[in-house]
Amino acid sequence: MLLSFTLAGLRALAAEPPASWVDPDTGHRVIRLTREPGSDSFYFNYNGFTPDGKKMAYTTTNGISVLNLETLEAKPIVTGRARPIVVGRKTSNLYYTRPTDNPFFSTLWRVNLDTGETRKLADLPCRAGVSTINADETLGAGTFIEGDANAGGAYDGTVPLGKMTDVNLGEPENKGEMMAQRLAAALPMTMFTINLQTGKIKTLLQHNTNWLNHLQFSPADPTLLMYCHEGSWQMVDRIWTIRTDGSHNQLIHKRSMENEIAGHEWWGADGETVFYQLHFPRGGHVSFIASYNVKTGQRVWLQYNPDQSSIHDNSSPDGKLYCGDGDNRSPWIFLFRPVILPNQRTLGRNLIKGGYLESEKLVNMTKQNYRLEPNPSFTPDMKYIVFRSNMFGPDYAFAVEVAKANPTP
């Protein structure tokens, strides 16, 4: 009996992924950040880092944990079913929601990642979710479907429960069908802000039959909110911004070609640049990381090739580099360096600035099941790119060093 337990333990130990390695195809060092099978870094545009850059929150099968990025020591910070929102830009508070016994209701909480102090902030309205916190941590923002309207079970307002298995199945195989079903239902929605001190809710949009989703506050301007008209990208003008007083509801990119798609948008660290992927047309060979500065109106389009494509891209804190998580056609974690083409005395005003991306492969992801999207993000010191992966079976969070460990792999 003792021998069988010992052999089982040895097999489990042997199956554990390496703590670090140098990718033989790229020469870059990869570090496994998390030890728990089923642990994931955050979605690519959710901030998971404390303002001092020393800690990172991540999800586990039993809640949310916090990782010391200097020592790689981790500890649970939220136990049980919970859905993270973001780590604050001003404090070390992590904001999250918890489900209740009723599948259409949830509660809003915060926990300090340094002290562990926890506070319930509010009971949310029926079918409501909060998905972003503003720069000075005074407001949250979210949406809910009004009344009892539904789309036959397709994205129609039940509360996310949090992941409870070692292997994240990722996106559903029939995601496209479900999204088309939900978009066609045209369910009336409300977009709101919630005061994090008082719990008071303020309506921004009401009775809106667009599918309102992916809310993101500017990381610098506490009154500026980005959101999207969700749905298959070729069917919607997706990316919008609005002020917290309900004014300046502005479309950021309008489609001009059949099957043109724009999406997977995110804020630059400056809090005034909106980045997004742009494809002319869907399934074609012309793609860009595009950006729009909400203060100056400047647009920049950086072209990339199909063999540089990613599900998600992201930008470095200083705005000088980009990264991508690859896809089934190009299974790599990428580093991108932008090249802006000089203006050859172009005549005209308000023209788009053009350029292209030079890519460097950082991690071979051929063993990745891309139903789990890696969701890359730069660490605050810009020395690493964090991503999630199931290349060893269960999910773990990893980091790849931007600088090469081996210059001649």
Language-model segments: residues:
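Beta-strand-rich domains and repeat architectures in extracellular enzymes and scaffolds
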Residues: P18, R29-N62, L215
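Short, conserved, GDST-rich strand-edge loop motifs in beta-rich repeat architectures
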Residues: P99-T100, G142-A186, C228-V236, Q277-G284, ...
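Blade/loop signatures of beta-propeller domains
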Residues: L13-I31, A180-T190, N350-L351
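Hydrophobic beta-strand positions that form the internal "hydrophobic ladder"
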Residues: M56, L94-Y95, L139-G140, L224-L225, ...
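Conserved blade-ending motifs and adjacent loop-strand segments that build the rim/top face
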Residues: V300-D313, L347-P380
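Surface loop/turn motifs at the tips and blade-to-blade linkers of beta-strand repeat domains
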Residues: T34-S39, I77-G80, L121-C126, L204-N210, ...
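Blade-level signature of beta-propeller repeat domains, shared across WD40, Kelch, NHL, RCC1
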Residues: L372-P409
